Amino acid sequence: MVAPAAFGATTADEALLKAYQAFNAGDAISLARYAPALEGSVLEPYGEYWALELRLEDAPDAEVRAFLVKHAGTYLAQALRADWAKQLGKREHWARFERALAPLAARDLELRCYDWAARLARGDKAVAAEAKSIWLEPGDLPAGCQLLADKLAARGAIDAGEVWQRARVLFERGQITAAKSALGYLPRAQAPDELLLAQAATQPQQVLARLPRHFGRRATREVAVLAALRLASSDPRLAAEALEGPVVRRLNASERAYLWSRVALEGARAHDGEALDWYARLGREPLGYDLAAWKARAALRRGDWPTVRDAIDAMSAADSRQPAWIYWYGRALAAQGKREAARAYYQRISGGTDFYGLLATEELGALAAIPAPSFVPSDAQVAAARGIPGLARALELYRLGLRTEATGEWVFAIRGMDDRELLAAAELARRESVYDRAISTANMTVRLHDFRVRYPVPFEGVFGDYARTHGLDEAWVLGLVRQESRFIVDARSDAGARGLMQLMPRTARWVARKIGLVQYEPHDVAEVETNITLGTGYLKMVLEDLGHEVLASAAYNAGPRRARSWRDAKPLEGAIYVETIPFSETRRYVKNVMANAVIYAALLGEPRSSLHARLGVIPAADAGGGEDDMLP
């Protein structure tokens, strides 16, 4: 990892960045050369912290404790303590680990696993039951959790059924290597045939076409279950056919019910018209949240309001209280003529500025009203926020481009702040153009709010200018950028998307050619106006191709081809299209973009905006248009 270069860096800035590079390279000698230049600066503790982190495995406890005392109550002290505790847990120094862990309130999954392992070493018999939840975590387990799993298995606390349960979870997600690793906990005599297991991953239909040898063995039957799961995740219809075949018919009733539940779930996600019929195969089996939610979504697309209610009724009380399901339960009641009962549901979530809060308000006959700021911090209060050491360090780190460290400092510094303090900190971030912190900090208030800070309009009209150039709604563009990057100029995603409008390099080059942006170079995408030029240009092309802001929003996140594929054979209410997007990330994204657009329209002084009107109706899949496969 290489630190970004700071524009106009001073000698102290250069020293900090070179020290950071040395730390990431594990170069203690170079770090020692640059760290003294940090003395007297607000970031002085970082030199000491990085040096100690590099030798934490061998550092004496006394030296670590001295740092923790010297920097007590800081983000760096918490970060060092967490890493120190993990080192002690890794070496199974349980007494020292527990002393190091005790003051830490924030504990990630790995620390929790080491804590369970420490308690297990003390003979705590409650650990096995408490720790089982981590066993079903998808993907590879972190080192501390792997250690815990090894110790539980050695004590016989993980039985064969639980091993196969984890394998099912992983296989269904396509995490085959992790699934094979989990199966390593089985005794050799109970292990599956490796060739059959490999075939279940790559050719599941063949495994299910004829009865494998040794089908009486549990391992062979379980591999058949894994093959059916793998097939269901790629082709629910083929899986449904296989469930009627000779192999699955030999499974027991519980195994068959489980497989039908997965076929129904994947069918609903794929918008298969038979999904609800597959749900019917489950009878009165408990559904669990995902199954119930997707049953409700499948029923929404079919317009089957009684089944929408039944599916929500099948959820736990906590799950059914989510705004989405309160809203759709109200809609189901209204569709069945129970309008007063429906109003009671809408009233439970109306007034909010989230997607379903806005829709519920409109169902009650009103439009969202953005309140005037209930508190605006004075310059003195903002100056006081600037004087908080953690916030001061965060701003310096943001200035130098060390965003991960800066965000850690900021989040730690605002813990426990009241609404006035939060709004002062948010205003400080806004003035310093750290818009993501301004937004997230202002969003944390409980009673006092300032939507001007929650929904900033930065860069002095640039977004409006380019929106008008392309005939786009400025409120929608701002709503999309707020969701994409929180207005972080140098935002970079794990996939490589860059800038305010999070453009992939290939997309940026393609758009630059299309709009005739001469002398475009890949590094230009990080420049504000270039990024907005390319982003709004691409958004215009997507909107022209798909013909609807909802579809264009989905396409901007997940690609035009997917957005088109999620349409129905008949025109579909926009809110139902959004709620039934198969990807949870894209579903949240589109909800937030469209709700943001309503808020921005109000803040920009546009006529009162209806979310229902923005969502509109999504044309049927065969309605014509929207077929430009050239769009990246």
Give the location of each predicted region.
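Catalytic glycan-binding domains that act on GlcNAc-containing polysaccharides
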Residues: 49, 241, 245-251, 256, ...
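Alpha-helical adaptor scaffolds
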Residues: 51-53, 65-72, 81-86, 90, ...
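Alpha-helical solenoid scaffolds that mediate protein-protein interactions
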Residues: 34-39, 67-71, 100-105, 131-138, ...
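Generic helix N-cap/helix-start motif at coil->alpha-helix transitions
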Residues: 7-15, 40-46, 58-59, 73-81, ...
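Single-residue signature of alpha-solenoid repeat helices
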Residues: 31, 97, 127-128, 179, ...
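N-terminal leader/linker segments that initiate helical-solenoid repeat arrays
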Residues: 6-50, 199, 370-391, 399
